[in-house]
C-alpha cells in the first residue's frame, strides 16, 4: 500500500543520512560509550525527558541502521548544544551530577577532541531533525491529502505562470528529461 511505500522511502533517505554520518564518525568516539550510558541512566533515574535517556544501555556505537536513529539523536543531544555547537558545560541536566567529577572531566576532554571534527558534528546536528520513518495516523492523513492535491496545485501554478507570462524552467527541464528518458 502507499503508506508502506512512502515509509520505505523515508527509511531509505534516513539511512542514507546515517551512512553519511557513520562514514565521518571519528575513531575516538568509541570512548563515549560508557559516558553516554552513564548519562542516559542518570537522565532516566532523574526523570529528565531527553533523547539522552535512550543511551542508558549503550554497549556499542550506533550503526547506520534506521533502528539506531534514536541512539544517534541521543548522542547528538549529549554532545551538542541546540545550535549545533560542542557543549562547553557538563552538568546534571544532561546526566552528570555535580559529584561525578572524574566522568565529567573525561567527557569534557572528549568534547574538546571532538570539536576538531567539524563535518562529523555538522552531520550529527542534522540527525536531530530527521523524522521518525513511520507515519502516525494523523501524519499519514495529511500526506495522503497533500498527494491528492498536488496535481491540482501544479495545474494552478502553471496557470499562474502563464497568466503572468513567466517561464518555469524547472518544469521545462523535468519535462525534457522525461521525454528523453533516463539512460
Residue ranges and their predicted role:
Residues 2-167:
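Conserved ATP-driven helicase/translocase motor core recognized via long
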Residues 165-176:
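Conserved pre-motif I regulatory segment
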Residues 175-183:
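Conserved RecA-like ASCE ATPase "motif II neighborhood" in helicase/translocase motors
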Amino acid at each position: 500500500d502507499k503508506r508502506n511505500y512512502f515509509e520505505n522511502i523515508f527509511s531509505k533517505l534516513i539511512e542514507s543520512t546515517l551512512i553519511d554520518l557513520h562514514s565521518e564518525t571519528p575513531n575516538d568516539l568509541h570512548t563515549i560509550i560508557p559516558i553516554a550510558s552513564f548519562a542516559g541512566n542518570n537522565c532516566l533515574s532523574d526523570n529528565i525527558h531527553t533523547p539522552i535517556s535512550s543511551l542508558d544501555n549503550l554497549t556499542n556505537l550506533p550503526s547506520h541502521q534506521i533502528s539506531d536513529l534514536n541512539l544517534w539523536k541521543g548522542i547528538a543531544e549529549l554532545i551538542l548544544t541546540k545550535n549545533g555547537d560542542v557543549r562547553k558545560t557538563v552538568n546534571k541536566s544532561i546526566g552528570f551530577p555535580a559529584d561525578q567529577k572524574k566522568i565529567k572531566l573525561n567527557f569534557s576532554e572528549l568534547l574538546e577532541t571532538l570539536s576538531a571534527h567539524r563535518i562529523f558534528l555538522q552531520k550529527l546536528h542534522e540527525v536531530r531533525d530527521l523524522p521518525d520513518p513511520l507515519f502516525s495516523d494523523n501524519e499519514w492523513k495529511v500526506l495522503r491529502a497533500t498527494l491528492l492535491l498536488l496535481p491540482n496545485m501544479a495545474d494552478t501554478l502553471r496557470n499562474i505562470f502563464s497568466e503572468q507570462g513567466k517561464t518555469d524552467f524547472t518544469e521545462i527541464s523535468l519535462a525534457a528529461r522525461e521525454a528523453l528518458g533516463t539512460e
